[in-house]
């Protein structure tokens, strides 16, 4: 029954995407079918097949080791505020977001910059990009951008495509925006992991977002023009660093900007949510609903969707609330509110944890529309009106991609 419900959830999400398509007659069944199959296959390999699960666990172990090295840098600056004594001192509540999550973002961004400098990222992107381009029958630039999102976030995508943005057709531009929204950056992945989100789920979600973003981008905005961009004129950065030290320093400064942005937005939105909840609770109290909140309203509205994705009805309100928070606010706030349930064993079953972890794993939220429009318009001011028109539709495609990954994850966890 649970497995069939997951299948129903996939059908519902695909139906929603089909209904939102701007040109239903131009939908390529070859690309859409291949993307769906690839998204399912990646999920199956990493969540169900023993060899794939073994690899995911080993990579997750490696990520945790990297986080430990990040803590070494944090401890140098903040001392014992990062150490295990904090948990003892505060009875298990010694995890401080600003001392653990934000420094990890800075460290990983610097590390990624070094890997770009020595050519590792370039090789991975070209190999994976070529594979996805052939498998999905998409343009080279679409596969390039989609694969790049494993390592870079939506803020960095405009810089990646700047050298050839004038040659991107409307569909390729839409796909680039969708891919950025549907994914997470490698640096922020560490931040989510630090909150207790299973790393193997984050890794699987990041890989599944590649075909998932393409799938829903091509459903909502089918390709109607041929590509004018080739791999021969692709570049990873406009001004590459001249040394590995410069690469590390530049990456660290970029990480600082990302960390500062995360801290600023999370702090502001947590406070805004508290204000909204105070207002809702106050008004609700007049009618006997003094415990009403934004989270509870979103939970009721999205609970049916969470249920059809595979979440048990007893947890559907919570799942719907977190998905709503991610969409209305951002994924960091949603993961932050999800974190307490991860810290207490047995609070949620494994399938629910997986579905929520996958559903929240992406930049798709209303605030991202402003980020994308601003970032892409900065590198292509003359295309700003076109980019603004694509924003809301791209958000829908990216959200559906995240929910599809979550539904697929629930399907395979249910089989295990």
Swiss-Prot record:
<dbReference type="Pfam" id="PF07662">
    <property type="entry name" value="Nucleos_tra2_C"/>
</dbReference>
<dbReference type="GO" id="GO:0005337">
    <property type="term" value="F:nucleoside transmembrane transporter activity"/>
</dbReference>
<feature type="transmembrane region" description="Helical">
    <location>
        <begin position="3"/>
        <end position="23"/>
    </location>
</feature>
<feature type="transmembrane region" description="Helical">
    <location>
        <begin position="96"/>
        <end position="118"/>
    </location>
</feature>
<feature type="topological domain" description="Cytoplasmic">
    <location>
        <begin position="119"/>
        <end position="172"/>
    </location>
</feature>
<dbReference type="InterPro" id="IPR002668">
    <property type="entry name" value="CNT_N_dom"/>
</dbReference>
<keyword id="KW-0812">Transmembrane</keyword>
<feature type="transmembrane region" description="Helical">
    <location>
        <begin position="247"/>
        <end position="267"/>
    </location>
</feature>
<feature type="transmembrane region" description="Helical">
    <location>
        <begin position="32"/>
        <end position="52"/>
    </location>
</feature>
<keyword id="KW-0997">Cell inner membrane</keyword>
<feature type="topological domain" description="Cytoplasmic">
    <location>
        <begin position="374"/>
        <end position="394"/>
    </location>
</feature>
<dbReference type="GO" id="GO:0015293">
    <property type="term" value="F:symporter activity"/>
</dbReference>
<feature type="transmembrane region" description="Helical">
    <location>
        <begin position="197"/>
        <end position="217"/>
    </location>
</feature>
<feature type="transmembrane region" description="Helical">
    <location>
        <begin position="395"/>
        <end position="415"/>
    </location>
</feature>
<keyword id="KW-0813">Transport</keyword>
<dbReference type="Pfam" id="PF01773">
    <property type="entry name" value="Nucleos_tra2_N"/>
</dbReference>
<feature type="transmembrane region" description="Helical">
    <location>
        <begin position="353"/>
        <end position="373"/>
    </location>
</feature>
<dbReference type="Pfam" id="PF07670">
    <property type="entry name" value="Gate"/>
</dbReference>
<dbReference type="GO" id="GO:1901642">
    <property type="term" value="P:nucleoside transmembrane transport"/>
</dbReference>
<feature type="topological domain" description="Periplasmic">
    <location>
        <begin position="268"/>
        <end position="352"/>
    </location>
</feature>
<dbReference type="InterPro" id="IPR011642">
    <property type="entry name" value="Gate_dom"/>
</dbReference>
<comment type="similarity">
    <text>Belongs to the concentrative nucleoside transporter (CNT) (TC 2.A.41) family.</text>
</comment>
<keyword id="KW-1133">Transmembrane helix</keyword>
<feature type="topological domain" description="Periplasmic">
    <location>
        <begin position="1"/>
        <end position="2"/>
    </location>
</feature>
<dbReference type="InterPro" id="IPR011657">
    <property type="entry name" value="CNT_C_dom"/>
</dbReference>
<feature type="topological domain" description="Cytoplasmic">
    <location>
        <begin position="24"/>
        <end position="31"/>
    </location>
</feature>
<feature type="topological domain" description="Cytoplasmic">
    <location>
        <begin position="218"/>
        <end position="246"/>
    </location>
</feature>
<feature type="topological domain" description="Periplasmic">
    <location>
        <begin position="53"/>
        <end position="95"/>
    </location>
</feature>
<dbReference type="GO" id="GO:0005886">
    <property type="term" value="C:plasma membrane"/>
</dbReference>
<keyword id="KW-1003">Cell membrane</keyword>
<feature type="topological domain" description="Periplasmic">
    <location>
        <begin position="194"/>
        <end position="196"/>
    </location>
</feature>
<dbReference type="InterPro" id="IPR008276">
    <property type="entry name" value="C_nuclsd_transpt"/>
</dbReference>
<feature type="transmembrane region" description="Helical">
    <location>
        <begin position="173"/>
        <end position="193"/>
    </location>
</feature>
<dbReference type="InterPro" id="IPR018270">
    <property type="entry name" value="C_nuclsd_transpt_met_bac"/>
</dbReference>
<keyword id="KW-0472">Membrane</keyword>
<protein>
    <recommendedName>
        <fullName>Putative nucleoside permease NupX</fullName>
    </recommendedName>
</protein>
<feature type="topological domain" description="Periplasmic">
    <location>
        <position position="416"/>
    </location>
</feature>
């Amino acid at each position: 029954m649970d497995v069939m419900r997951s299948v129903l959830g996939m059908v519902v999400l695909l139906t929603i995407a089909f209904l939102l398509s701007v040109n239903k007659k131009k939908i390529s069944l070859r690309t859409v079918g291949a993307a769906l199959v690839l998204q399912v296959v990646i999920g199956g390999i990493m969540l169900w097949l023993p060899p794939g699960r073994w690899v995911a666990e080993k990579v997750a172990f490696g990520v945790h080791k990297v986080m430990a090295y990040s803590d070494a840098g944090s401890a140098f600056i903040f001392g014992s505020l990062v150490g295990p004594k904090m948990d003892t001192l505060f009875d298990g509540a010694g995890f401080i977001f600003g001392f653990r999550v934000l420094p990890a973002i800075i460290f990983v961004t610097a590390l990624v910059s070094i890997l770009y400098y020595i050519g590792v990222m370039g090789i991975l992107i070209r190999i994976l990009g070529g594979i996805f381009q052939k498998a999905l029958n998409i343009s080279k630039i679409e596969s390039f951008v989609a694969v790049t999102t494993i390592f870079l976030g939506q803020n960095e995508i405009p810089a990646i495509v700047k050298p050839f943005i004038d040659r991107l057709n409307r569909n390729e531009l839409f796909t680039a925006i969708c891919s950025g929204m549907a994914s997470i950056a490698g640096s922020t992945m560490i931040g989510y992991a630090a909150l207790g989100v299973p790393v193997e789920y984050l890794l699987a979600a990041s890989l599944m977002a590649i075909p998932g973003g393409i799938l829903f981008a091509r459903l909502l905005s089918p390709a109607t023009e041929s590509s004018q961009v080739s791999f021969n004129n692709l570049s990873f950065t406009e001004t590459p660093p001249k040394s590995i030290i410069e690469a590390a320093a530049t990456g660290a400064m970029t990480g600082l900007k990302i960390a500062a942005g995360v801290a600023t937005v999370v702090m502001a939105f947590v406070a805004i949510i508290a204000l909204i909840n105070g207002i809702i609770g106050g008004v609700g109290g007049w009618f006997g609903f003094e415990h009403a909140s934004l989270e509870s309203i979103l939970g009721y509205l999205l609970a049916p969707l969470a249920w059809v994705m595979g979440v048990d009805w007893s947890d559907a309100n919570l799942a719907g609330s977190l998905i709503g928070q991610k969409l209305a606010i951002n994924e960091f706030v949603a993961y932050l509110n999800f974190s307490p349930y991860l810290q207490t064993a047995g609070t949620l079953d494994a399938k629910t944890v997986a579905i929520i972890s996958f559903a929240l794993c992406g930049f798709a939220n209303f605030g991202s529309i402003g980020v994308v429009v601003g970032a892409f318009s900065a590198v292509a001011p003359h295309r700003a009106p076109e980019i603004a028109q694509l924003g809301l539709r791209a958000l829908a495609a990216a959200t559906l991609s995240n929910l599809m990954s979550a539904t697929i994850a629930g399907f395979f966890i249910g089989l295990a």
